[in-house]
Amino acid sequence: MAKILILECLIFTLLSCGAVFWSIRPAAGGVLGRMHVYPPVIVDRCRALGIIPESGEGPEYNLERAVFILVSIPLQSCLCFFFGGCRDFLSAFLQSYLMWITELWFEVLVFGCGWFCHASRWVIPGTEDLADAYHDYWYHIKGGILGMSMRAVLAAPVGFLVNLLADLIA
């Protein structure tokens, strides 16, 4: 069972990595396509410089997030049902939550604290003097802690879908 859980988490984390790389492609605005990972002081500077609009992250970010969630929930449901053997809400919810928090902490520790805090690729021209904000690990860790509750909300539909699949197939 542990091997299956690890494999499910690995598959889902790889999907998430693909989504991150997709969101920083040049057609999506490069690193500006991930403004939600930047500390507020950097976002404020970018707004002041006119690099990003005053209105927020923009419709592209919201669309990409919605697509990722709409792909992730059925994918996790299939992983839990067909691969993990879940047939009830609770077991599917727990497996889905485990996949979500594995993906979350991978993103926080590897992409946030590792790549974002140390790669010059993420430094936006005009914000170079904000090095302390770029190296703020705590900002990413706080986001991970807060994100754990949001992941529980995202795991619930997986539990419902798996429960529905079990009823339909049984």
Give the positions of each predicted feature.
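Juxtamembrane/disordered regions of integral membrane proteins
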Residues: 1-98, 102-170
